[in-house]
A protein has these predicted regions:
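Short, highly charged C-terminal tails/helix-capping segments
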Residues: 40, 148-154
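Hydrophobic ligand-binding cavity/cleft-lining segments
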Residues: 1-38
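Beta-strand/loop substructures that line and gate deep hydrophobic ligand-binding cavities in soluble
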Residues: 78, 87-139
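Structural motif
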Residues: 11-13, 80-82, 112-114
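A generic structural signal for beta-strand entry/edge sites
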Residues: 1-3, 50, 83-85, 113-117
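Hydrophobic pocket/interface hotspot
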Residues: 17-18, 27, 51, 77, ...
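Glycine-rich portal/gate segments that line the openings of hydrophobic small-molecule binding cavities
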Residues: 39-89
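Short, surface-exposed coil-to-beta transition loops
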Residues: 5, 38, 70-74, 100-105
Length: 154
């Protein structure tokens, strides 16, 4: 298992970023890499609240972690500090033992020149997930988050 850290500046205040992190309709739009679509099945945005999300590859290829062309994960919100931090525990729904195990996902918001520096740390990522893929997917999601909050096309 390993840890990744990805950050990005967003031209929006921490309050707006925090709200977008916890809005299931917004999550379906931004928390997904390019080339995939997102479906939020369950989303209880409170400490201890559960969520379940599926990402689906748009093309014909793309081996999913949970099934053909699909990555489904579930988890719960461990800590919610308004306008500062969201901590989640996440697990892939998979039959592959190499992809199993809980990951901790911490998103930290730091005020930065009228905007927000968003830092995403994944801890406990299974070794079967290439680190470059995890980092690239997180970077793409943060690009979509910025586009959504800044009111510009992706």
């Amino acid at each position: 298992m390993y840890t990744t850290r990805v950050s990005r500046h967003v031209d929006a205040p921490p309050l707006a970023v925090y709200r977008t992190l916890l809005d299931p309709e917004a999550v379906a739009r931004w928390r997904v890499p390019y080339g995939m679509t997102c479906r939020v099945h369950e989303f209880d945005a409170r400490e201890g609240g559960a969520f379940r999300v599926s990402l689906r590859y748009e093309g014909e290829d793309g081996a999913g972690k949970s099934g053909p062309r699909t990555d489904t994960y579930h988890g719960r919100f461990v800590e919610l500090v308004p306008d500062e931090r969201v901590v989640e525990v996440v697990e892939f729904e998979t039959a592959d033992p190499l992809l199993r195990g809980a990951m901790t996902l911490t998103t930290t918001l730091v005020p930065d020149g009228g905007g927000t520096e968003v830092l995403v740390v994944h801890e406990g990522v299974p070794d079967a997930v290439p680190a470059a893929d995890n980092e690239t997917g997180t970077r793409m999601a943060l690009d979509r988050l910025a586009a959504l909050l800044e009111g510009r096309p992706e």
